[in-house]
C-alpha cells in the first residue's frame, strides 16, 4: 500500500488540505507515476480534459516516471494529448519506458524535457496469445498493426525514419537523457542546479 502525502494551505477562508496530486493539479501538473493500465489512463485523460476546460490557453505539464504499460491505455492518453488545445509539456524524471517513452515524445514540440539522470526505453509492443491457431493468428496481426502505429508516432515526433525506429525497437532500446535528446524523443535536458541559483 502506498502512502499519499497531504499538504495544508492557508487561505483567507481558512485551512484547506489536499492530497499531493490534487495540489499539483492546481498548478496544471499531472504526475504519471505508475504502470499504465485502463483505469490509470482514464484518470490521466480526465485530468487533461479538466485542465483544458479550465483554461484552454495555458500549457499543461505531464511529469513521467513510469515503466510503461498497455498499448491501448497509453494510446488513449496520447490521443487526448494531441486532441486538446493546450500544449502538453512533458518531463521525464526517473524513467519513461515503453508507452511512457511514447508519451514523453508526444509532448508539444520544443517542450519535451528530461532530468539529467532519467532513463528512456523504447521497444516493440509485446503480446501473448493462447487458443486455437486462428485466434493466435488474429492476435499476431493485431500486435504487428500496433507496432506499425507506434513506429509511425515515433517517426512523427522524432523525425527518424520508420525503418530506423523499427530497427532500434527490435529489442529494448535504452537511452540516457542526452541520447534521447539526440534521438528526438526530447528537446531539452534540464541541467539547472537550483541550489546554486538561489
Swiss-Prot record:
Superkingdom of origin: Bacteria
Recorded coiled-coil stretches: none
Enzyme Commission (EC) number: 3.4.21.92
An example Gene Ontology molecular-function term: ATP-dependent peptidase activity
Catalytic residue list: 98 (nucleophile), 123
GO cellular component terms, semicolon-separated: cytoplasm; endopeptidase Clp complex
Sorted UniProt keywords: Cytoplasm, Hydrolase, Protease, Serine protease
Task performed by this protein: Cleaves peptides in various proteins in a process that requires ATP hydrolysis. Has a chymotrypsin-like activity. Plays a major role in the degradation of misfolded proteins.
HAMAP family listed in its UniProt record: ClpP
Protein name as annotated: ATP-dependent Clp protease proteolytic subunit
Organism: Leptospira interrogans serogroup Icterohaemorrhagiae serovar Lai (strain 56601)
Amino acid at each position: 500500500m502506498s502512502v499519499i502525502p497531504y499538504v495544508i494551505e492557508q487561505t483567507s477562508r481558512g485551512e484547506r488540505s489536499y492530497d499531493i496530486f490534487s495540489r499539483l493539479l492546481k498548478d496544471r501538473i499531472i504526475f504519471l507515476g505508475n504502470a499504465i493500465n485502463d483505469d490509470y489512463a482514464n484518470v490521466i485523460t480526465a485530468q487533461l480534459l479538466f485542465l483544458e476546460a479550465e483554461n484552454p490557453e495555458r500549457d499543461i505539464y505531464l511529469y513521467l516516471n513510469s515503466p510503461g504499460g498497455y498499448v491501448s491505455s497509453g494510446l488513449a492518453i496520447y490521443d487526448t494529448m494531441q486532441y486538446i488545445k493546450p500544449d502538453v509539456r512533458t518531463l521525464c524524471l526517473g524513467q519513461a519506458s515503453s508507452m511512457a517513452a511514447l508519451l514523453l515524445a508526444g509532448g508539444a514540440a520544443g517542450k519535451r524535457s528530461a532530468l539529467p539522470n532519467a532513463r528512456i526505453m523504447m521497444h516493440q509492443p509485446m503480446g501473448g496469445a493462447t487458443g486455437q491457431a486462428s485466434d493466435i493468428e488474429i492476435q499476431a496481426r493485431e500486435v504487428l498493426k500496433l507496432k506499425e502505429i507506434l513506429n509511425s508516432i515515433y517517426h512523427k515526433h522524432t523525425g527518424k525514419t520508420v525503418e530506423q525506429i523499427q530497427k532500434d525497437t527490435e529489442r529494448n532500446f535504452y537511452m540516457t537523457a542526452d541520447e534521447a535528446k539526440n534521438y528526438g524523443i526530447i528537446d531539452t535536458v534540464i541541467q539547472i542546479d537550483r541550489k546554486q541559483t538561489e
